[in-house]
Amino acid sequence: MINAVGGNIPGATIGDDQSIFDNKIQDTIKAIELNLYGTIIPTLIFGELIAEKGKGSIINISSLAASRPLTRVLGYTVAKHGIDGFTKWMSTELALRYGDQVRVNAIAPGVFLTEQNRTLLTNEDGSYTDRAQKFINGTPYRRLGDPSELEGTLIYLLSDASAFVSGEVVFVDGGFNSWCGV
């Protein structure tokens, strides 16, 4: 099962001309609910079916934001931290109760240009925004990811090739999380 519920809420994004204290708390709560509960609830529902079957793999979608906090998106960052902790907890809980054939992992994508974040990362003329350029400059690959580049990791984590892998958060980010910038 790939659990890919999530995203951000426009009102939960702190504008360039705002401070953290201008944050709309209700929208931040909605972003946390969307991402964290949007992961926990389906994992519990489908996880029970997988556990009863005695074999399966659950993959939650985390984010580089859980490891390297992103500015302007408080609720999203907090929720992704929660997803990492929940993934580790759930993997342990299922393994201890149902054995080593039930696995839970997460992938933490770096910055991928998608329809969901296009307005945040590109200008109207198609050029990159300053924010996108900061991500590119902080990534050893010097580019944004293509969503198709997540497929290999997803296939691996769903397959028997990862039979001894559980409770892990795998970064797919062009080296962003690993690089200090020098």
What positions do the PLM features span?
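Conserved mid-core segment of classical short-chain dehydrogenase/reductases
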Residues: 7-29, 52, 72-75
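A glycine/serine/threonine-rich, flexible loop-to-helix segment
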Residues: 15-18, 111-139, 179-182
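Catalytic Tyr-X3-Lys loop
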Residues: 21-40, 55, 59, 83-84, ...
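Amphipathic alpha-helical dimer-interface segment in Rossmann-like NAD(P)H-dependent oxidoreductases
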Residues: 30-52, 66, 91-96
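Active-site helix of classical SDR
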Residues: 43, 79, 87
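Residue(s) in the substrate-gating loop at a strand-loop-helix junction
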Residues: 63
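Short C-terminal tail/terminal secondary-structure segment
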Residues: 68, 155, 166-182
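Short, small/polar-rich loop/turn modules that mediate ligand/substrate recognition or access, typified
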Residues: 98, 103, 165-167
